[in-house]
């Protein structure tokens, strides 16, 4: 239910854009995002920090898009958010010597430090690629192509990155059903 709720604002944005246009779609996106946060708070008692950041960015850039009737503000949001995610992952790894992915998943998975570092770098690279693809599409393709990319392309890229991560992690999982703490074979 929680994951489905994450996609509702995006789906409503896409449908409204196709039926109405940029301004209407941005307004629907902002309202749906605010409702999403209210529902999450009501149903689960809390909203995760990442969701608050994303919702704030959607509201800010969505309102700019609606006010100016110009999609470039939402295009900037995608670029900025992906860039920030990449920077945070890289700074955590190289400045603080702590792969952020380990902080997020370390309770569920036991992996060697080298694997956490590789996974963290992989996701940083993923966010950089998303940022660069977004810049390319927003500057060189039609507005409609960008909306399609934003609605489905990034989701597809995320699914592929998740599968690659899963395949990478699988090699470190215990093969005999034991709960090895070091994650080594």
UniProtKB/Swiss-Prot annotation:
Species for this entry: Haemophilus influenzae (strain PittGG)
Entry's transmembrane regions: 27-47, 53-73, 76-96, 118-138, 149-169
InterPro entries xrefs: YciB
Organism domain of life: Bacteria
Lipid bilayer topology: Multi-pass membrane protein
Record-stated family: Belongs to the YciB family.
Name listed for the protein in its UniProt record: Inner membrane-spanning protein YciB
Keyword set, alphabetical order: Cell inner membrane, Cell membrane, Membrane, Transmembrane, Transmembrane helix
Compartments where located: Cell inner membrane
Primary location group: membrane
Summary of the function given for this chain in its UniProt record: Plays a role in cell envelope biogenesis, maintenance of cell envelope integrity and membrane homeostasis.
GO CC annotations, alphabetized: plasma membrane
HAMAP family: YciB (MF_00189)
């Amino acid at each position: 239910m929680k994951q489905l709720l994450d996609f509702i604002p995006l789906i409503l944005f896409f449908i409204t854009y196709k039926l109405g246009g940029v301004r209407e779609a941005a307004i629907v996106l902002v309202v749906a995002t605010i409702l999403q946060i209210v529902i999450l708070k009501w149903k689960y008692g809390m909203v995760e920090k990442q969701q608050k950041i994303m919702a704030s960015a959607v509201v800010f850039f969505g309102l700019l898009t609606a006010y100016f009737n110009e999609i470039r503000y939402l295009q900037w949001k995608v670029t900025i958010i992906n860039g920030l995610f990449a920077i945070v992952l890289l700074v955590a790894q190289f400045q603080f010597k702590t792969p952020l992915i380990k902080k997020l998943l370390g309770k569920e998975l036991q992996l060697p430090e080298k694997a956490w570092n590789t996974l963290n770098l992989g996701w940083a690279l993923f966010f950089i690629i998303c940022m660069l693809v977004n810049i390319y599409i927003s500057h060189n393709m039609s507005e409609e192509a960008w909306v399609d990319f934003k609605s489905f392309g990034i989701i597809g890229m995320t699914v592929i990155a998740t599968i690659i991560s899963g395949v990478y992690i699988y090699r470190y999982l215990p093969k005999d059903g034991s709960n090895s703490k070091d994650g080594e074979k």
